[in-house]
Structure formats: C-alpha cells, structure tokens
C-alpha cells in the first residue's frame, strides 16, 4: 500500500495530551503502514520529526528525520528513522537551550532546555532493539518527540513567556544567523 499523507492534529486536540500506548506487535500491517505514512507526512510538512499522537494515533512511536530545511538550515542529514517504544536510559548533565517549534503548534517557537546528549533504546521497524547515543540537534528532536508520547508539548518546557516568539520572528533570526 502506498504511503498516505495524514492530517496533523493541532494544539487543543485531547490526543496530544494523552500518554500513548505501547506498540505490542511491531510487524502488524497497520503499524508498518503508519510508519510509512508518518515518514511521508513529516517530509511533506518539511519537519524533522513527527510522533504518532500528532496524527491522532496514540502509539509509542515516532520518526526522527533530521535534514536541513528553511527552519533548520544546519540540521544534520539522516535517513528518516522509526523509533518504536523508545526509552531514554541516560543523559548528560549539560543542558542546552534551543529554539523549537512543532507541526501541532503552528506559528510559535519556544526556547527549550534539553539534555545535550542522551542514551536511548528503541525498537526499529524490523523488530531489532537499537541502542544509541544521540547528541545536539538529533538529541533535541528525540526528546521533543519522546515528550509527545507522554502528552507533553514543547510549550510546556519553555521556562518563561519571554522565551516564546512567532514563527516570523524565528525566521528572521535564522536568516540573520545564516548570512
């Protein structure tokens, strides 16, 4: 079956605030189709990650798809990767702030503190357990998407309203910093 573009639900939809369900059968055709659909949806939306709850499918599953784009011109290039039933098993003490946005919270950016490095475990789409150390931008994507699985949005992590800007203001910052 061909991948389908799924509608991305927006802030206010109760699914975004729920704890997502464990994926019991990774090889289930519905889960495999959802993975393909999420990969197509995040690419079309020009995002760097998307979690299953963002398309109203409350499973512990997300895609990390880092690549340079107008919002993140310095993002590292990586293959879109399905991360199923993920866990953070360790993290650095170093916390770094970075601007985040979300396909489910359009028009707003927030300065969010995250661990600079994390040790993670997840099952890939083929049923293999993966263990990795992620750093910098990819670690930030993982932590952002992981939060979605517990009903947490990036705006919940912003420490002050002064650390919130519009997408337009953010684009001006990006443009200024890439010249």
Curated annotation (Swiss-Prot):
Fe cation binds at residues 102, 144, 148. One of its GO terms (molecular function) is peptide deformylase activity. It holds the Pfam family Pep_deformylase. Its EC number is 3.5.1.88. GO terms for biological process: co-translational protein modification; translation. Its cofactor is Fe(2+). Removes the formyl group from the N-terminal Met of newly synthesized proteins. Requires at least a dipeptide for an efficient rate of reaction. N-terminal L-methionine is a prerequisite for activity but the enzyme has broad specificity at other positions. This is Peptide deformylase 2. It comes from Nostoc sp. (strain PCC 7120 / SAG 25.82 / UTEX 2576). The gene is def2.
């Amino acid at each position: 079956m061909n991948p389908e573009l799924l509608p991305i639900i927006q802030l206010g939809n109760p699914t975004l605030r729920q704890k997502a369900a464990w994926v019991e059968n990774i090889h289930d055709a519905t889960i495999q189709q959802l993975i393909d659909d999420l990969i197509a949806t995040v690419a079309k939306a020009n995002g760097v990650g998307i979690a299953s709850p963002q398309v109203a499918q409350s499973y512990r599953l997300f895609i990390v798809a880092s690549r340079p784009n107008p919002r993140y011109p310095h993002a590292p290039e990586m293959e879109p990767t399905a991360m199923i039933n993920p866990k953070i098993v360790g993290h650095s003490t170093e916390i770094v702030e970075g601007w985040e946005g979300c396909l489910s919270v359009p028009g707003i950016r927030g300065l969010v503190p995250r661990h600079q490095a994390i040790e993670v475990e997840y099952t890939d789409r083929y049923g293999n357990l993966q263990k990795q150390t992620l750093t910098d931008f990819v670690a930030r994507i993982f932590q952002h998407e992981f939060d979605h699985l517990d009903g947490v949005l990036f705006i919940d992590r912003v420490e002050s309203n002064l650390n919130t800007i519009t997408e337009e203001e953010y684009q001006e910052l990006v443009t200024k910093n890439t010249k």
